[in-house]
């Protein structure tokens, strides 16, 4: 199984990587964030970052640090014959990066300048949480980058970045150029 985990800062283009690989290269795309959003809806909770973090922490405590990867792989295995591989977006805990590697997969880190990312998030208005100040955006990002050192189930994106095999910068707004750069990088790793 070809397995790609995608991590990165908010608004950098993690879902874009998944969508490109699904549309242009036949991968199944699963957003871990969408799994968590669905669980919020199931529990009648507002879809807010604090609830997403709480549920992901709960699942990690119950099922291990790689549980979100395992949930996505389980979904993939139900229809794998229809796909070239699995791409998962929004890895935010180092146990998820470790699990991707244990399964023979590759981790990609996607990043962009904080102002570029803030403007993307603010303009898309995916949820009411996207309507925040730049300072709030940076504060939340800091919390997610470094997590709680006393809680291995917390978000710790800085360590996920360190464990990534490929770093992609997505500074522009030209999705075709980004898709071409992504494809070239993945070909060099024999993933396309």
Where are these regions (language model features)?
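Walker A/P-loop
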Residues: 15
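ATP-binding Walker
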Residues: 12
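Small-molecule kinase domains that catalyze NTP-dependent phosphoryl transfer to phosphate-bearing small molecules
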Residues: 126-181, 185, 192
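P-loop (Walker A) phosphate-binding loop of NTP-binding proteins
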Residues: 9
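Extreme N-terminal starter segment of soluble prokaryotic enzymes
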Residues: 1-4
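ATP-dependent small-molecule kinase phosphotransfer cores
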Residues: 28-87, 91-98, 127, 135-139
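Conserved phosphate-donor/acceptor-positioning beta-strand/loop module used by diverse small-molecule
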Residues: 89-90, 101-132
